[in-house]
């Protein structure tokens, strides 16, 4: 893709998300979603081949269906209330329809089937945009309409997402699919907070975006897309392999890494609301997530395949490009735990 075209597409995508974030009118919110979706399709097809075409078609059909349900919800809400205001969605039917539309856009269960397939079919750079930036707009709308959302519907979808995200990633060997199921699971954790503490949901989103972005960057830097290719990383760069292992544990929510903060605060918030069974099940599912992350660690560090090369360090295969922003991002995505008391005061 030519740079001027790519710049226009990226600008359109960012503008669409910003329009959703700053809008208090349903029509401009919907237009923002459409701009975002139409800009994302060519980004997914950046490397033009049958797999990317299939992935972008699946993405387009799912997002178009979600947009239709969203527009229907907005129209019915307009007929009932006579207002276009985003905050004014007090009818239960329109609220449920909007929740389903946003769940489809986010890839929440039972509308999650497109997420692993689309992520697997595109490049790592397109995948990181799909699993990070594309979550901001739907979650911001959920944040705004959180007082009128049916908590039972949302909690059911959240628990199903955590369950699917934990089980789905167990037998995977493709790194992009593992991160897609991880995304579904993390979305479930975020959505549980929508009706209890929406601000905590946004904190969780920021930490999730940070960790996922750094993980994708390290995979792209080491040119790893499967567990087999990940096992060769130690020979090429032990430092990158060590950082990948730390990020895997952080994504799994193991203390004292950054990924533990949102899980800890969410479980604490749920127990404050006299909920015991739900956080217990969530913690048990988090163990399954941690299991497949530790399997990736095992592939990275403890399995070194036989090599005909006498030199252990394959210095000639090292990547000459040095990402400048990577060190501070790695530090923040693994070492935020000391800031937890300040976050607890804010959220």
Swiss-Prot record:
It is found in: Mitochondrion inner membrane. GO terms for cellular component: mitochondrial inner membrane. InterPro entries: Complex_I_Subunit_2 (IPR050175), NADH_DH_su2_C (IPR010933), NADH_UbQ_OxRdtase_chain2 (IPR003917), ND/Mrp_TM (IPR001750). It catalyses: a ubiquinone + NADH + 5 H(+)(in) = a ubiquinol + NAD(+) + 4 H(+)(out). GO terms for biological process: mitochondrial electron transport, NADH to ubiquinone. Signal peptide: none annotated. Core subunit of the mitochondrial membrane respiratory chain NADH dehydrogenase (Complex I) which catalyzes electron transfer from NADH through the respiratory chain, using ubiquinone as an electron acceptor. Essential for the catalytic activity and assembly of complex I. This is NADH-ubiquinone oxidoreductase chain 2. It comes from Nasua nasua. The gene is MT-ND2.
């Amino acid at each position: 893709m030519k740079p001027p075209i790519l710049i226009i597409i990226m600008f359109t995508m960012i503008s669409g998300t910003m329009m959703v974030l700053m809008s208090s009118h349903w029509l401009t919110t919907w237009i923002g979603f459409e701009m975002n979706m139409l800009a994302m399709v060519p980004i997914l097809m950046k490397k033009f081949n049958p797999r990317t075409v299939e992935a972008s078609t699946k993405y387009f059909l799912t997002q178009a269906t979600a947009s239709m349900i969203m527009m229907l919800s907005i129209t019915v809400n307009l007929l009932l209330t006579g207002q276009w205001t985003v905050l004014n969605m007090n009818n239960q039917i329109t609220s449920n329809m909007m929740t389903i539309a946003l769940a489809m856009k986010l890839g929440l269960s039972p509308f999650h089937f497109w997420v692993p397939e689309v992520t697997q079919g595109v490049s790592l750079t397109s995948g990181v945009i799909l699993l990070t930036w594309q979550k901001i707009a739907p979650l911001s709308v959920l944040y705004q309409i959180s007082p009128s959302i049916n908590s039972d519907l949302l909690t059911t979808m959240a628990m199903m997402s955590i369950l699917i995200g934990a089980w789905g990633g167990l037998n995977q060997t493709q790194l992009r699919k593992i991160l897609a199921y991880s995304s579904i699971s993390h979305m479930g954790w975020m959505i549980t907070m929508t009706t209890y503490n929406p601000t905590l949901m946004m904190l969780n989103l920021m930490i999730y975006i940070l960790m996922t972005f750094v993980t994708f960057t390290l995979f792209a830097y080491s040119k790893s897309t499967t567990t087999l290719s990940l096992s060769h990383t130690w020979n090429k760069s032990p430092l990158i392999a060590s950082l990948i292992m730390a990020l895997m544990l952080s994504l799994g929510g193991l203390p004292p890494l950054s990924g533990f903060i949102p899980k800890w605060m969410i479980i604490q918030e749920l127990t404050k609301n006299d909920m015991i069974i739900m956080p217990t099940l969530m913690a048990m599912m988090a163990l399954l997530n941690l299991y497949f992350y530790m399997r990736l660690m095992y592939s990275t560090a403890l399995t070194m395949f036989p090599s005909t090369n006498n030199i252990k360090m394959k210095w000639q295969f090292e990547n000459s490009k040095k990402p400048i922003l990577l060190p501070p991002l790695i530090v923040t995505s693994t070492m935020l735990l000391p800031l937890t008391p300040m976050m607890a005061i804010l959220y």
